[in-house]
């Protein structure tokens, strides 16, 4: 690839920027960032690439365009760059829900342009280019979404790109993707936000100093709950049907736990705790985390 445009240079956008530059995946990297604060940080950090003042300047000269913005901004960006995109340019993104994005692409993107959705499974609760890491995507899964109108050769091109970035690639449908991540990512974040909110409400209602006594459990949930609120609002809204079903399943299991606790059902509780404990071992075995206390953060 000769030229790549990164639209949005926050945590993940800047991580891509660092990696593309180090691996010399493109001859030129263009950066479009509307936040003056982020632009100042990019300059202060002396990150590689060329900051462009307009989407036209970047889009008209790029072989690959990567959307690294909140999903709620996709439509407006598409409408701004449509007439400037060269016919052979590929577009991808890093969004966490795909069905709604497919609808936006099909409705607003100029006909003939290939947008192949991506979802690299990487990130952090912090945001901004100062927190980006060159190895952010190393050995992480990247989901590529296959749709009817997508050319196989273009999927191969994008697959090679993500492998050069360091990711492990798997191809699946938007429907399958959104169902999987409603459980593995979206529901856990929703639970984290609500657990921390419950702690706040309890502290206020009981007039206890509660937060300062946070044990490991609440502390780890609070880390997740510190994630970018705009990004997660978009995810919750865009995958609302699957997330609603995941919430129903969680409530069903939570009510069963409540019933077992109140009735002191030893057999049922121990069985559930034993079964769920095995998931942690499986996650480590699949190299999705490390087997160290405190998740290796110390």
Regions found by a protein language model. Name each.
Residues 77-130:
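Rossmann-like NAD(P)(H) cofactor-binding subdomain of soluble oxidoreductases
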Residues 68-70, 95, 146:
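Glycine-rich, N-terminal phosphate-binding loop of Rossmann-like dinucleotide-binding domains
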Residues 134-220:
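Internal alpha-helical scaffold of NAD(P)-dependent oxidoreductase catalytic cores
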Residues 207-275:
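Interdomain hinge/lid region at the active-site interface
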Residues 56-85, 89-90:
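Rossmann-like NAD(P)-binding element
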Residues 3, 28, 114, 141, ...:
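Residues at the starts of beta-strands that form the adenosine-phosphate
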Residues 1-60:
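NAD(P)+-binding Rossmann beta1-loop-alpha1 motif at the extreme N-terminus of oxidoreductases
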């Amino acid at each position: 690839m000769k030229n790549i445009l990164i639209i949005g240079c926050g945590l993940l956008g800047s991580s891509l920027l660092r990696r593309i530059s180090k691996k010399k995946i493109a001859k030129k990297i263009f950066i479009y960032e509307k936040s003056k604060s982020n632009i100042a940080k990019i300059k202060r950090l002396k990150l590689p690439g060329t900051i462009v003042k307009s989407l036209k300047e970047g889009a008209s000269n790029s072989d690959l365009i990567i959307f690294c913005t909140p999903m709620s901004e996709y439509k407006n960006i598409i409408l701004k760059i449509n007439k400037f995109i060269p016919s052979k340019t590929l577009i991808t993104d890093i969004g966490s829900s795909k069905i709604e994005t497919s609808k936006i692409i099909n409705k607003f993107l100029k006909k003939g342009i290939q947008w192949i959705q991506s979802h690299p499974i990487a990130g952090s609760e912090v945001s901004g280019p100062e927190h980006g890491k060159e190895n952010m995507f190393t050995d992480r899964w990247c989901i590529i979404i296959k749709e009817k109108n997508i050319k196989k050769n273009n999927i191969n091109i994008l697959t090679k790109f993500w492998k050069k970035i360091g990711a492990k690639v798997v191809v699946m449908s938007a429907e399958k993707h959104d169902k999987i991540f409603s459980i593995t990512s979206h529901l856990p974040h929703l639970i984290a936000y609500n657990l921390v909110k419950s702690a706040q409400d309890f502290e206020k209602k009981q007039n206890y100093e509660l937060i300062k006594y946070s044990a490991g459990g609440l502390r780890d949930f609070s880390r997740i709950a510190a994630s970018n609120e705009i990004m997660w609002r978009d995810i919750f809204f865009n995958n609302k049907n699957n997330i609603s079903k995941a919430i129903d399943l969680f409530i069903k299991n939570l009510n069963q736990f409540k019933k077992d606790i109140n009735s002191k059902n030893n057999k049922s509780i121990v069985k559930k705790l034993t079964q769920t404990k095995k998931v942690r071992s499986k996650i480590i075995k699949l190299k999705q985390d490390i087997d160290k206390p405190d998740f290796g953060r110390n």
